[in-house]
UniProtKB/Swiss-Prot annotation:
One of its GO terms (molecular function) is RNA binding. This is RNA-directed RNA polymerase. It is found in: Virion. Keywords: Magnesium, Nucleotide-binding, Nucleotidyltransferase, RNA-binding, RNA-directed RNA polymerase, Transferase, Viral RNA replication, Virion. Its EC number is 2.7.7.48. It comes from Rotavirus A (strain RVA/Human/United States/DS-1/1976/G2P1B[4]) (RV-A). Residues 501-687 form the RdRp catalytic domain.
Length: 1088
C-alpha cells in the first residue's frame, strides 16, 4: 500500500499536533483469523486511548496485523479547538501584504475593495461574485500548503529550489491573508457577511487561485509566471486572463511546420515530413506588439518579456513555454459579473443601418437550406421520431430548473420545487399540461436567467425556458444532430471522432500555396444582429419542410418548433438588480434552448460560407476544408500560386472587412501554419490543448457531495496534467484526504485509507497511480469491494413518498402506455427508475440520501461487514483470468514522432511506441443491430446496461421485448433467427466491457488499442470458438502491457494458456457483470 497512507498519517500528525491528539489505525482482512486479530487490535487501541495510555506497545504486539492486514481507515481525535491555521500562518507571513488598486477595473464591484465598501449592509451582500463554490475551505487549503512546506523544508538540490520558490510565493499569500485574518467558512463552505465585511471582497477566491498556482510551480519560469499572476490578480479581477492569453491567437501563426501528422484516407494520423513556412505580414506583428504593450500597461513584466524573447526565433522547441503561459492565465479564477452587466453586454452593440442586406440574405438562405437538408429525409419519410416528438421529449426531460418555484402536491406530501420534471408531472395531474401551446416570453412573461462563468471571458447569461420549449425542440434537434454526426464540417458532432482527427484535417492541406482562416465568432452568436436572420432562416426552413409531408403529427411538430422561434424573436428577460426585478427587452440569442449547440453550428457554418463566397469574387482559390466547432470556425483555402506576405495581409483585411459589413464583431485571423480556437490550437504542426481547469474554485454549486468533488478535483488534475499543467500530486492527495474525511463528532474524525478510495467500488475517488486504472484482484481488494456493494444504493423517504403518489405513478404509466404496444417490464421499470433518479436533483432528496450514505460508510469504515454477494464485477472476471498469464521482458522501439508536446513523459512514450487513435471506441451499443432496429420503430433509447441485459435473455423474450416497443413481428422474428443476433451478443458485450473499463477516458483515449505493435506482444493460442472470451483475454492483456509501460517505461510480453474447460465458465460469468457507478466514474463522465 503506497504513498497515500503514509502522507495521511503525516498529515494527521501535522494537523493534530497537540498532546491530546490520538491516531488509531483500523485494519481489516479477508482472512478470518487475521480479521479477528484486527478487531481485537482495534478495541485494545480504543481502550488504551480512553485511559490515556500509549499505543506503541500494541503496535509491536499486533505486528502481524500491521504487516499482513490492509489499512481500512484512520480514526483521529483531538480535543483542541483548532485556530491552528492562524497560528501556523504567522510563521509564513513575512512579506509585505498586497494592496489592491481600487480603480483598475471598469465595473466598481470588480475592484477588490473591502466588502463593506461594496455592500454597506448585510441585506445588500451577496457572495455570488466571489463564491469559490467548492466543498472545501480556504483554511483547509492553507493547511494543505503549510503541510507540504513543512514536510519539504529539508529538501536538497533541485527539490530545494522548488521549495524556495513555493515558500516565497506562499509568503505573499500568507502575509496578505494574515493582515485581515483567515475568513472562516460556515457549514456549507460559504463566506458570510460578518466574516467578510472587514476583508477584501475577493480575498477567498484570490487566495484559492493563488494556492492552486503556487502548488503548480516547479521551474523558475513557472515561478515567474505564477508570481506575476498572483500579484496582479489581487487587483485585476476582470481582464487579466484575457490580456495574458490574447497573444496566442497570433503566436500560432509564427511557427514554421517542419514535419507534422496528417489525416489519411483511413482517418488515421500518419507522419508527413512536409515543410511549410510561416508567412507573417508586418501588420500581424504590429497587432502582436499592441497586445504586448497592453500587457505591460496592465503591469505585467516577465510574461511579455518571455514572449518577446521567444519571438527572436519562434522555435517550436521553445513553444511549450508559450503554451504554459496560455494555460496558466486561466488559473487566476473565474470572472463573475453581476447578471445585469452580463445581459447588457450583449445589448450594447448599436444597430447600424449600413449593413450589407445582400449578405444577410445569403446568410439566412444558407441557414434555411441547411435546416432543410438536415431534416428532409426524416420529414419525407414521416419519421416516427417526428411523429412522437412529444413522447420523445418527455422521456428525455431534464430535471433542471423550469424558471419558477411552484407548490406541488404528491399524494399527502406538499413540496416547493422549480424542477422541470416535477412541473410536468404536476401539470399532467391537474390538467394544465398543454404541450401544444408554447408560452410567450414577451413583456408579460419575461425569461428568468441562469449564468455561465468562465475564466478570461465575460459572464454569459442562459435562458431558463419553460419545459414546453424543450418538448417542442427535442425531436427535431435530435434529427439535426444525427445529420451532423456524418457531416465532417461539424467537428464537434462528427461520428466518434476525437480532437486528433480535427487536428490531422487541418494539417492535411497546409502547404506553401494555402492559408487557413480562423475566426472566433462567440461575439456574433450572442449579438442582436444575428437574431432576425438566424431565427428567420430556421423558420423559412421549417416552412419548406412542412410542405414536404401530409402527416398531421409531423406538421404539428414542425409548427411547434416554428412557434418557439417566433416567440423568441420577441424576448424579454428578468434580471434581479438588488431587490427589484428588472424586465429588459432582449433581442439576442442566448444558450438555454435545446437547439443552442446545433443551431449555432449551423449558423456559424452559414456565416463562414457567406464570407468565403464574398472573398471568392476577388481571389481564386479552392476551399479544401470548412469546419465549425462550437464558437469557432475555420477554413483552409488553396490558391494557385505560392502565398506571399502581401496576399496574407490582403485576404486578412478583406475577410475582416467582409465580417464588418455584417456588423459582426469577431476576431478573424489568417495564417499559413496554425490555428487557435477555444478547444485546441495547432502550432508548428503540433497540437496543444489549454490546461485551464480550475481546481480550487468552481463555476457553480451543484448538489454533489464532498466525495464527488474530491473525485472531480482529481479528474481535473489529471486532465490538466495530460495537457501540460501539473499541480503537485502530494497537494492533490492532501486535498482528497481533507475532502473525504467524515466527521463523527466535533472532535472525532474518520479518514478512509487508500484502499477504500482507489478500489473500484461505489466509493472510488482516485487512482493510486496516475493514468492507470487498476482493478484489484487480491482477496482483500475483492473483499472490500463486496462490502461496499452491500451498501451501495441508499433509500430516501421523500423520494419513496413521491414515487408512491398517484401523480408520479400516473405519469410513469402514461409514458409507458404511449410508448409500449404490449407489456414490457424491463422498459416500464426502466422508465420508473429513470424518473425516480431525476428526483435526485431535488435538494432534500439528495441530502437525505447523502446522510444515509455517510452513516453506512461510517459503520463500514470501522468494521467491514462480510457480504456474500452473488453480483459479479469486472474485478472477478479479471481475477479469474490473471493466473493464466505469464509475462516476459520485451522491447518496442520508439517509432512515431511526437505531435502532442505537452503530454507527460510516460504517456508520450507509449504513443511513440504504439501510435495514437483518432476515434472513440463505441461503448454505448448504438452500433448494434438491435439498437438500430429499436430506433427505427420507437423513440425509446435503451442504455448499454439494458441492451446487455436484454441480449442475454431467451430468444422468445427478446422477441417480446422488441414487439412491445412497436417493432413488427416479422422484423423481430427475422432478427432473432438471423446471424446478426449472435453477432450482436458479441458486439454489445464488447461495448459493455469497454464502457466498464473506461477506455474512452483519461489517457487510454489516446492509445491505439488495435496497434499491431501492441498485438505482437501478446500470444494467446486459439482454443475453441468463443469470441467473447478471446476478446476479454486480449483486452486484459493489452491493458496489462500498457499499464506496465506507463509505470516502468519498458515493455513486457504476455503469454496466456487459458484452459478450454474454463472458457465456458468464464463466458457464462461474463453475462452477469454488474456495473459500478462511483464519484470517480461520474467525474470522468463529467469531463465529457
Amino acid at each position: 500500500m503506497g504513498k497515500y497512507n503514509l502522507i495521511l498519517s503525516e498529515y494527521l500528525s501535522f494537523i493534530y499536533n497537540s498532546q491530546s491528539a490520538v491516531q488509531i489505525p483500523i485494519y481489516y482482512s479477508s482472512n478470518s483469523e487475521l480479521e479477528s486479530r484486527c478487531i481485537e487490535f482495534h478495541s485494545k487501541c480504543l481502550e488504551n486511548s480512553k485511559n490515556g495510555l500509549s499505543l506503541k506497545k500494541l503496535f509491536s504486539e499486533y505486528s502481524d496485523v500491521i504487516e499482513n492486514a490492509t489499512l481500512l481507515s484512520i480514526l483521529s481525535y483531538s480535543y483542541d479547538k483548532y485556530n491552528a491555521v492562524e497560528r501556523k500562518l504567522v510563521k509564513y507571513a513575512k512579506s509585505k501584504p498586497l494592496e489592491a488598486d481600487l480603480t483598475l477595473n471598469e465595473l466598481d464591484y470588480e475592484n477588490n475593495k473591502i466588502t463593506s465598501e461594496l455592500f454597506p449592509t448585510e441585506e445588500e451582500y451577496t457572495d455570488s461574485l466571489m463564491d469559490p463554490a467548492i466543498l472545501t475551505s480556504l483554511s483547509s487549503n492553507l493547511n494543505a500548503v503549510m503541510f507540504w512546506l513543512e514536510k519539504h523544508e529539508n529538501d536538497t538540490a533541485e527539490k530545494l529550489k522548488i521549495y524556495k520558490r513555493r515558500l516565497d510565493l506562499f509568503s505573499i499569500v500568507a502575509s496578505t491573508i494574515n493582515k485581515y485574518g483567515v475568513p472562516r467558512h460556515n457549514a456549507k463552505y460559504r463566506y458570510e457577511y460578518d466574516v467578510m465585511k472587514d476583508k477584501p471582497y475577493y480575498l477567498v477566491t484570490w487566495a484559492n487561485s493563488s494556492i492552486e498556482m503556487l502548488m503548480s510551480v516547479f521551474s523558475h519560469e513557472d515561478y515567474l509566471i505564477a508570481k506575476e499572476l498572483i500579484v496582479l490578480s489581487y487587483s485585476n479581477r476582470s481582464t487579466l486572463a484575457k490580456l495574458v492569453s490574447s497573444p496566442m491567437s497570433i503566436l500560432v501563426a509564427l511557427v514554421d511546420i517542419n514535419g507534422t501528422f496528417i489525416t489519411n484516407e483511413e482517418l488515421e494520423l500518419e507522419f508527413s515530413n512536409k515543410y511549410v513556412r510561416a508567412i507573417v505580414p508586418d501588420q500581424t506583428f504590429d497587432e502582436l506588439k499592441q497586445m504586448l504593450d497592453n500587457m505591460r500597461k496592465a503591469g505585467l513584466v516577465d510574461i511579455p518579456k518571455m514572449i518577446q524573447d521567444w519571438l527572436v526565433d519562434c522555435s517550436i522547441e521553445r513553444f511549450p513555454l508559450m503554451a504554459k503561459i496560455y494555460s496558466w492565465s486561466f488559473h487566476v479564477g473565474f470572472r463573475k459579473q453581476k447578471m445585469l452587466d452580463a445581459a447588457l453586454d450583449q445589448l450594447k452593440t448599436e444597430y447600424t443601418e449600413n449593413v450589407d442586406d445582400e449578405m444577410y440574405r445569403e446568410y439566412t438562405m444558407l441557414i434555411r437550406d441547411e435546416v432543410v437538408k438536415m431534416l428532409e429525409e426524416s420529414v419525407k419519410h414521416d419519421d416516427h421520431l417526428l411523429q412522437d416528438s412529444e413522447l420523445a421529449g418527455l422521456l428525455s426531460m431534464s430535471s433542471a430548473s423550469n424558471g419558477e418555484s411552484r407548490q406541488l402536491k404528491f399524494g399527502r406530501k406538499t413540496i416547493f420545487s422549480t424542477k422541470k420534471n416535477m412541473h410536468v408531472m404536476d401539470d399532467m395531474a391537474n390538467g394544465r399540461y398543454t404541450p401544444g401551446i408554447i408560452p410567450p416570453v414577451n413583456a408579460d412573461k419575461p425569461i428568468p436567467l441562469g449564468r455561465r462563468d468562465v475564466p478570461g471571458r465575460r459572464t454569459r447569461i442562459i435562458f431558463i425556458l419553460p419545459y414546453e420549449y424543450f418538448i417542442a425542440q427535442h425531436a427535431v434537434v435530435e434529427k439535426m444532430l444525427i445529420y451532423a454526426k456524418h457531416t465532417r464540417e461539424y467537428a464537434e458532432f462528427y461520428s466518434q471522432s476525437n480532437q486528433l482527427l480535427s487536428y490531422g484535417d487541418v494539417t492535411r492541406f497546409l502547404s506553401n500555396n494555402s492559408m487557413v482562416l480562423y475566426t472566433d465568432v462567440s461575439q456574433w452568436d450572442s449579438s442582436q444582429h444575428n437574431t432576425q436572420p438566424f431565427r428567420k432562416g430556421i423558420i423559412m426552413g421549417l416552412d419548406i419542410l412542412a410542405n414536404m409531408t401530409n402527416d398531421a403529427r409531423v406538421i404539428q411538430t414542425l409548427n411547434l418548433y416554428k412557434q418557439t422561434q417566433i416567440n423568441l424573436m420577441d424576448s424579454y428577460v428578468q434580471i434581479p438588480d438588488g431587490n427589484v426585478i428588472k424586465k429588459i427587452q432582449y433581442g439576442a440569442v442566448a444558450s438555454g434552448e435545446k437547439q443552442t449547440k446545433a443551431a449555432n453550428s449551423i449558423a456559424n457554418l452559414a456565416l463562414i460560407k457567406t464570407v468565403l463566397s464574398r472573398i471568392s469574387n476577388k481571389y481564386s482559390f479552392i476551399t479544401k476544408i470548412i469546419r465549425v466547432d462550437g464558437d469557432d470556425n475555420y477554413a483552409v483555402l488553396q490558391f494557385n500560386t505560392e502565398v506571399t506576405k502581401q496576399m496574407v495581409q490582403d485576404v486578412s483585411n478583406d475577410v475582416r472587412e467582409t465580417y464588418a459589413r455584417m456588423n459582426a464583431k469577431v476576431k478573424a485571423l489568417v495564417s499559413t501554419v496554425g490555428i487557435e480556437i477555444a478547444k485546441r490550437y495547432i502550432a508548428g504542426g503540433k497540437i496543444f490543448f489549454r490546461a485551464g481547469i480550475n481546481l480550487l474554485n468552481n463555476e457553480k454549486r451543484g448538489q454533489s457531495t464532498q466525495w464527488d468533488q474530491a473525485a472531480v478535483l482529481y479528474s481535473n488534475y489529471i486532465v490538466n496534467r495530460l495537457r501540460g499543467f501539473e499541480t503537485d500530486r502530494e497537494f492533490i492527495l492532501t486535498k482528497i484526504m481533507q475532502m473525504t474525511s467524515v466527521a463523527i463528532t466535533g472532535s472525532l474524525r474518520l479518514f478512509p485509507s487508500e484502499r477504500v478510495l482507489t478500489t473500484n467500488s461505489t466509493f472510488k475517488v482516485f487512482d493510486s497511480e496516475d493514468f492507470i486504472i487498476e482493478y484489484g484482484t487480491t482477496d482483500d481488494e475483492v473483499y472490500i469491494q463486496r462490502a461496499f456493494m452491500s451498501l451501495s444504493s441508499q433509500k430516501s423517504g421523500i423520494a419513496d413518498e413521491i414515487s408512491a403518489s398517484s401523480t408520479f405513478k400516473n405519469y410513469v404509466s402514461k409514458l409507458s402506455e404511449q410508448l409500449l404496444f404490449s407489456k414490457n417490464n424491463i422498459v416500464s421499470r426502466g422508465i420508473a427508475l429513470t424518473e425516480k433518479a431525476k428526483l435526485n436533483s431535488y435538494a432534500p432528496i439528495s441530502l437525505e440520501k447523502r446522510r444515509a450514505q455517510i452513516s453506512a460508510l461510517l459503520t463500514m469504515l470501522q468494521k467491514p461487514v462480510t457480504f456474500k454477494s452473488s453480483k459479479i464485477t469486472i474485478n472477478d472476471i479479471l481475477k479469474d483470468i490473471k493466473p493464466f498469464f505469464t509475462l516476459s521482458e520485451a522491447h518496442l522501439p520508439m517509432q512515431y514522432q511526437k505531435f502532442m508536446p505537452n503530454l507527460p513523459e510516460n504517456v508520450q512514450y507509449i504513443i511513440q511506441c504504439i501510435g495514437s487513435r483518432t476515434y472513440q471506441i463505441e461503448d454505448d451499443g448504438s452500433k448494434s443491430a438491435i439498437s438500430r432496429l429499436i430506433s427505427k420503430y420507437s423513440v425509446y433509447k435503451p442504455s448499454i446496461e439494458e441492451l446487455y441485459k436484454v441480449i442475454s435473455l431467451h430468444e422468445n423474450e427478446i422477441q417480446l421485448y422488441l414487439i412491445s416497443l412497436g417493432i413488427p413481428k416479422i422484423d423481430a422474428d427475422t432478427y432473432v433467427g438471423s446471424k446478426i443476433y449472435s453477432q450482436d451478443k458479441y458486439r454489445i458485450l464488447e461495448s459493455y466491457v469497454y464502457n466498464l473499463l473506461s477506455i474512452n477516458y483519461g489517457c487510454y483515449q489516446l492509445f491505439d488499442f488495435n496497434s499491431p505493435d501492441l498485438e505482437k506482444l501478446i500470444r494467446i493460442p486459439f482454443k475453441g470458438k468463443i469470441p467473447a472470451v478471446t476478446f476479454i483475454l486480449h483486452l486484459y492483456a493489452k491493458l496489462e502491457v500498457i499499464n506496465y509501460a506507463i509505470k516502468n517505461g519498458s515493455w513486457i510480453s504476455l503469454f496466456c494458456n487459458y484452459p478450454k474447460s474454463e472458457m465456458i465458465k468464464l463466458w457464462k460469468k461474463m453475462w452477469n457483470i454488474t456495473s459500478l457507478r462511483s464519484p470517480y466514474t461520474n467525474a470522468n463522465f463529467f469531463q465529457d
